[in-house]
């Protein structure tokens, strides 16, 4: 009898209600089972989830459901990274308060996430804009302040002229603001900083322990931390060229071996010497102002055109008083890095070469590539940056660069310049302290008070939280807190006099730097429950995009260390395993030069070609490239539409099945339809066979087709489990396709009443295994199938969500036969299929019976038959 078509809309709503009523996914901290903490990066509540969210959270849910089935006490929470600029932009554009806009979006997105059937513990939900959350963040801030990990200082900052706020160096991408895309400028402001540089060495060394992180992410962090071992060299200013009070320029270099190739010294626009020289020099003052228009990050420097201003000052070469080098103020040198001064060796640094060519400075190669002739070697448009031997370097000639480094260091360390060594070895880090002050309203208020008499002091703990005022106006750019009539005015906690609140709010990356810790006990009055935090942390599996490799992930690594210093956690690293998933991408479409949505077009195959037209008018549509889904290009697919049309399980199955999870997945309507057909196929096979299997005890087959069914199922259990452990979801999906194909004929026999008792037992077990294996990917379908089978696993009534992962029998997983390649005189001629435990004599006899061996021997006997056990056979004719 044909089964009714599976109705995902009805089934999914039903099982989601059952899970919720049974509190199936709520986690008890006191559970004694081994813990497993799986977490996907929590979303910003922008309005609606997109297919990237579906893929990210589906992956995490597979891991959570699988680990739960394997007997772990799983923590799988969800929250909202809810502070940030878009809410303020919406307030300005739509005249809606950021709080209202944010919580409306949270409600919408929570409904969407729930419709996906994710096994989330919603009892631990919070938004970072909840007063209860940012209250604890303010407590943390004060704790870190008291431990000396927060400081306030004046510094050059990256200023986003569109968003009217400061950006951390990590938030400047190719010289532009990470959100607005505006070219970033330099400004000097007094800011609050987290002293992440206190942990530079620790953060670098810790990367070696993160063997479950992608090497690409670890490399990105290593480069960002940027440890370098170099030499700090003092260059004496040439007599008669230096202004009063200046006698030297101190330079940090990682390549002292190239000193004899030096062509210039460059100093920062903020170097004390540059400032002194700019007094009364309008041209230099103008150049310095131009330098200040670019960002302070290394990325900004790397993308800007390299410019310099010749100061007329000269410095003496450290090894030759008669050799003088010009001093430039340059836009590619930052005061915050090293000493604010560098020497340029054009032959062996591309930036220096470009600069030297622009200002017609001498280019002298001092490192000779292997195999080149010193007499004829020269530098063209590309600097030579590899290894070699030293040339044109006097006493260094013939040395390797490494030996030359040490020789230069040794000599200059022993050379006296005005009572001090001319050089000292020094370790530098590229990493700078994390500036967290933001001139925005919609963020966590910094809990500090400014008093003219007492200075800057923390808000007393009893007065926390410092709440954001609701009565603010967004009628113009800038920070509404600065303009608030009453909020910023407060009494000094020390003297009781008039004082003012800090009106800057925290960088929103602070909110996401410790949220994983709060999930362990979100009901606690303190930021953490130390026992719960130490039990659950580190997160066993963290899943999110590689775009967070530096920003969020580095800040989180700092925060666990800072919280450890403050006594809130006992771990150093927040995330044991990290997986960075690929994006969901889609074709793009244009009609009359305008982007059009895939929902508005029809695609047909005409004469072997895909042809697209508009649904409403039939107008031709140009099919473009496959790109990341984006609203601007309209190549987005709304998860609500997919779930309404096909069901959540189809959406989940498709994003898990089509490509390796670390790669992009191309969303296609045909792919979604194919996934949906598979959902219907599983349902039909199980539902039609269910009457015959419902009251049958599961039992592995021992012979014939029943044994084949059991072998296929047990092998799949082992393989799919291994695949999920390795996060190879697409391979697990492929194995389930194979298993369904293998079982389909036997299930149809059972449905037709043609299966014997042994086959029914084998099918009952195999079908239970199939249902339990599909559950992490398609949980609603799995529950519906098990209900159809009587709601029992191994004879016990249960929800699939609470059922254990099936156990395979090792004897059924081992292949009894193997295929051995057969060579004749060293060349493969065919294969031999034989029992795995066959002895050497049996293998030799079987080989002689093969037709292609008989033909090769032509009635004769072989000289020798070489059998490599379990590997290969070679017949020597």
Swiss-Prot record:
<dbReference type="GO" id="GO:0004823">
    <property type="term" value="F:leucine-tRNA ligase activity"/>
</dbReference>
<dbReference type="InterPro" id="IPR014729">
    <property type="entry name" value="Rossmann-like_a/b/a_fold"/>
</dbReference>
<dbReference type="InterPro" id="IPR002302">
    <property type="entry name" value="Leu-tRNA-ligase"/>
</dbReference>
<feature type="short sequence motif" description="'KMSKS' region">
    <location>
        <begin position="628"/>
        <end position="632"/>
    </location>
</feature>
<dbReference type="InterPro" id="IPR002300">
    <property type="entry name" value="aa-tRNA-synth_Ia"/>
</dbReference>
<keyword id="KW-0436">Ligase</keyword>
<keyword id="KW-0648">Protein biosynthesis</keyword>
<dbReference type="InterPro" id="IPR025709">
    <property type="entry name" value="Leu_tRNA-synth_edit"/>
</dbReference>
<dbReference type="Pfam" id="PF13603">
    <property type="entry name" value="tRNA-synt_1_2"/>
</dbReference>
<dbReference type="Pfam" id="PF08264">
    <property type="entry name" value="Anticodon_1"/>
</dbReference>
<feature type="binding site">
    <location>
        <position position="631"/>
    </location>
    <ligand>
        <name>ATP</name>
    </ligand>
</feature>
<dbReference type="InterPro" id="IPR015413">
    <property type="entry name" value="Methionyl/Leucyl_tRNA_Synth"/>
</dbReference>
<keyword id="KW-0547">Nucleotide-binding</keyword>
<dbReference type="Pfam" id="PF00133">
    <property type="entry name" value="tRNA-synt_1"/>
</dbReference>
<dbReference type="GO" id="GO:0002161">
    <property type="term" value="F:aminoacyl-tRNA deacylase activity"/>
</dbReference>
<dbReference type="InterPro" id="IPR009080">
    <property type="entry name" value="tRNAsynth_Ia_anticodon-bd"/>
</dbReference>
<keyword id="KW-0030">Aminoacyl-tRNA synthetase</keyword>
<keyword id="KW-0963">Cytoplasm</keyword>
<comment type="similarity">
    <text>Belongs to the class-I aminoacyl-tRNA synthetase family.</text>
</comment>
<dbReference type="InterPro" id="IPR013155">
    <property type="entry name" value="M/V/L/I-tRNA-synth_anticd-bd"/>
</dbReference>
<feature type="short sequence motif" description="'HIGH' region">
    <location>
        <begin position="43"/>
        <end position="53"/>
    </location>
</feature>
<protein>
    <recommendedName>
        <fullName>Leucine--tRNA ligase</fullName>
        <ecNumber>6.1.1.4</ecNumber>
    </recommendedName>
</protein>
<dbReference type="InterPro" id="IPR001412">
    <property type="entry name" value="aa-tRNA-synth_I_CS"/>
</dbReference>
<dbReference type="GO" id="GO:0006429">
    <property type="term" value="P:leucyl-tRNA aminoacylation"/>
</dbReference>
<dbReference type="GO" id="GO:0005524">
    <property type="term" value="F:ATP binding"/>
</dbReference>
<dbReference type="GO" id="GO:0005829">
    <property type="term" value="C:cytosol"/>
</dbReference>
<dbReference type="InterPro" id="IPR009008">
    <property type="entry name" value="Val/Leu/Ile-tRNA-synth_edit"/>
</dbReference>
<keyword id="KW-0067">ATP-binding</keyword>
<dbReference type="Pfam" id="PF09334">
    <property type="entry name" value="tRNA-synt_1g"/>
</dbReference>
């Amino acid at each position: 009898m044909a089964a009714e078509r599976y109705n995902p809309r009805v089934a999914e709503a039903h099982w989601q209600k059952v899970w919720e009523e049974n509190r199936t996914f709520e986690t008890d901290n006191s559970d004694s089972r081994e813990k497993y903490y799986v977490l996907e990066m929590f979303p910003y509540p922008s309005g609606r989830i997109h297919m990237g969210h579906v893929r990210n959270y589906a992956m995490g849910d597979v891991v959570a459901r699988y680990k739960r089935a394997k007997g772990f006490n799983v923590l799988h929470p969800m929250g909202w990274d809810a502070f940030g600029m878009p809410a303020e932009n919406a307030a300005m554009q739509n005249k809606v308060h950021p709080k209202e806009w944010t919580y409306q979006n949270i409600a919408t997105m929570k409904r969407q996430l729930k419709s996906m059937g994710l096994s989330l513990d919603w009892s631990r939900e919070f938004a970072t804009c909840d007063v209860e959350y940012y209250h604890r963040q303010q407590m943390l801030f004060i704790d870190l302040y008291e431990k000396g990990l927060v400081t306030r200082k004046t510094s050059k900052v990256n200023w986003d002229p569109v968003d009217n706020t400061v950006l951390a160096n990590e938030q400047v991408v190719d010289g532009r603001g990470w959100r607005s895309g505006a070219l970033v400028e330099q400004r000097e402001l007094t800011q609050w900083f987290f002293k992440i540089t206190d942990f530079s060495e620790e953060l670098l060394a810790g990367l070696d322990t993160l063997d479950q992180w992608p090497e690409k992410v670890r490399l990105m962090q290593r480069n960002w931390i940027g440890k370098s071992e170099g030499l700090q060299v003092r260059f004496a200013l040439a007599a008669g060229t230096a202004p009063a009070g200046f006698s030297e320029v101190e330079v940090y270099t990682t390549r002292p071996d190239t000193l004899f190739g030096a062509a210039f010294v460059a100093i920062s626009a903020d170097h004390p010497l540059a400032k002194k020289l700019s007094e009364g020099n309008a041209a230099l003052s103008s150049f310095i102002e131009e330098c200040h228009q670019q960002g302070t990050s290394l990325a900004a420097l790397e993308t800007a055109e390299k410019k310099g201003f010749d100061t007329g000052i000269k410095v003496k070469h450290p090894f030759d008083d008669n050799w003088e080098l010009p001093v430039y103020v340059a836009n590619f040198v930052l005061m915050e890095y090293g000493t604010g001064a560098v020497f340029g060796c054009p032959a062996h640094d591309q930036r220096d070469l470009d600069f030297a060519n622009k200002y017609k400075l001498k280019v002298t190669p001092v490192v000779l590539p292997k195999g080149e002739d010193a007499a004829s070697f020269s530098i063209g448009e590309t600097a030579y940056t590899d290894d070699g031997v030293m040339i044109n370097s006097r006493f260094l000639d013939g040395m390797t660069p490494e030996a030359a480094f040490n020789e230069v260091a040794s000599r200059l360390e022993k050379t006296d310049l005005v009572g001090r060594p001319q050089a000292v070895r020094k370790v530098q880090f590229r990493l700078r302290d994390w500036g967290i002050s933001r001139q925005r309203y919609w963020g966590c208020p910094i809990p500090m008070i400014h008093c003219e008499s007492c200075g800057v002091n923390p808000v007393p703990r009893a007065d926390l939280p410092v709440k954001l005022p609701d009565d603010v106006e967004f009628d113009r750019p800038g920070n509404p807190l600065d303009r608030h009539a009453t909020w910023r005015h407060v009494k000094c906690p020390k003297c009781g006099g008039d004082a003012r609140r800090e009106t800057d709010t925290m960088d929103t990356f602070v909110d996401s730097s410790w949220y994983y810790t709060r999930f362990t006990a979100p009901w606690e009055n303190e930021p953490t429950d130390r026992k719960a935090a130490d039990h659950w942390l580190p997160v066993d599996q963290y899943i999110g995009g590689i775009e967070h490799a530096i920003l969020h992930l580095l800040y989180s690594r700092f925060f666990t260390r800072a919280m450890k210093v403050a006594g809130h956690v006992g771990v150093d690293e927040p995330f044991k395993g990290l997986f960075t998933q690929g994006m969901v991408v889609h074709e793009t479409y244009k009609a009359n030069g305008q982007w059009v949505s895939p929902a508005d077009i029809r695609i047909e195959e005409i004469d072997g070609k895909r042809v697209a037209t508009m649904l409403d008018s039939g107008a031709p549509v140009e099919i473009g490239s496959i790109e990341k889904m984006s609203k601007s290009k309209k190549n987005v697919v709304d998860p609500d539409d997919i779930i309404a049309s096909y069901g959540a399980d189809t959406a989940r199955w498709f994003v898990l099945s089509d490509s390796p999870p670390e790669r992009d997945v191309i969303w296609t309507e045909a792919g979604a339809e194919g996934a949906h057909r598979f959902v219907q196929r599983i349902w039909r096979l199980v539902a039609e066979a269910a009457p015959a299997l419902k009251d049958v005890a599961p039992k592995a087959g021992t012979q014939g087709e029943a044994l084949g069914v059991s072998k296929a199922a047990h092998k799949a259990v082992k393989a799919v489990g291994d695949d999920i452990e390795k996060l190879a979801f697409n391979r697990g999906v492929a194995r389930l396709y194979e298993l369904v194909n293998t079982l389909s004929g036997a299930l149809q026999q059972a449905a037709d009443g043609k299966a014997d008792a042994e086959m029914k037992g084998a099918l009952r077990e195999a079908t239970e295994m199939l249902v339990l294996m599909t559950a992490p990917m398609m949980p609603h379908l799995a529950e519906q199938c098990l209900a159809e089978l009587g709601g029992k696993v191994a004879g016990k009534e249960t929800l699939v969500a609470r059922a254990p992962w099936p156990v395979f029998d090792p004897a059924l997983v081992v292949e009894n036969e193997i295929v051995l390649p057969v060579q004749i005189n060293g060349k493969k001629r065919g294969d031999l299929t034989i029992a795995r435990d066959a002895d050497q004599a049996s293998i030799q006899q079987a080989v002689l019976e093969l037709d292609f061996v008989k033909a090769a021997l032509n009635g004769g006997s072989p000289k020798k038959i070489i059998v490599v056990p379990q590997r290969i056979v070679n017949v020597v004719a």
